[in-house]
């Protein structure tokens, strides 16, 4: 049976990767080690923001602050940042990471770029 009060083992990791996925409706922040194993992940809805408040820059800032506390407990000091998406929360999440006194080695934008995929449906005639 799952016991919510059991504490995870503390890993001593110095290098990590932060994934910031910013959509028009939500923001998801994930801290991983260099192999990609997730250490901490949160979204605006998981913290308690509802509806349109999930897509605010303030929500992204709060997410980064909460997730970085867990990352600091695991010993992460140096980060590589990977940003995905086109939401308005990108910049505030980045500023919040810089305010947490991490050493940032690189910032990469991994947003997908369309290369004119499927043909759109025909225009409606009314």
Swiss-Prot record:
Recorded GO terms, molecular function?
A: rRNA binding; structural constituent of ribosome
In its UniProt record, which GO terms are filed under biological process?
translation
**GO terms for CC?**
ribonucleoprotein complex; ribosome
Q: Which Gene3D superfamilies is this protein grouped with?
A: Ribosomal protein S11 (3.30.420.80)
> What SUPFAM superfamilies would the database entry show?
Translational machinery components
Q: Keywords, A to Z?
A: Ribonucleoprotein, Ribosomal protein, RNA-binding, rRNA-binding
> Which PANTHER family does the annotation name?
40S RIBOSOMAL PROTEIN S14/30S RIBOSOMAL PROTEIN S11
UniProt record similarity statement:
Belongs to the universal ribosomal protein uS11 family.
Q: What does this protein do?
A: Located on the platform of the 30S subunit, it bridges several disparate RNA helices of the 16S rRNA. Forms part of the Shine-Dalgarno cleft in the 70S ribosome.
Q: What is this protein called?
A: Small ribosomal subunit protein uS11
Identify the species of origin. Orientia tsutsugamushi (strain Boryong) (Rickettsia tsutsugamushi)
């Amino acid at each position: 049976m799952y016991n919510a009060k059991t504490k995870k083992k503390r890993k001593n990791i110095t290098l990590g990767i932060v994934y910031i996925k910013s959509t028009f409706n939500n923001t998801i922040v994930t801290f991983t080690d260099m192999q990609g194993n997730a250490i901490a992940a949160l979204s605006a809805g998981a913290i308690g923001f509802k509806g349109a408040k999930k897509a605010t820059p303030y929500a992204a800032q709060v997410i980064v602050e909460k997730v970085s506390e867990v990352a600091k407990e695991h010993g992460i000091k140096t980060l590589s940042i990977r940003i995905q998406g086109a939401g308005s929360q990108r910049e505030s999440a980045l500023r919040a990471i810089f305010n947490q006194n991490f050493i940032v080695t690189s910032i990469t934008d991994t947003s997908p770029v369309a290369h004119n995929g499927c043909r759109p449906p025909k225009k409606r005639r009314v």
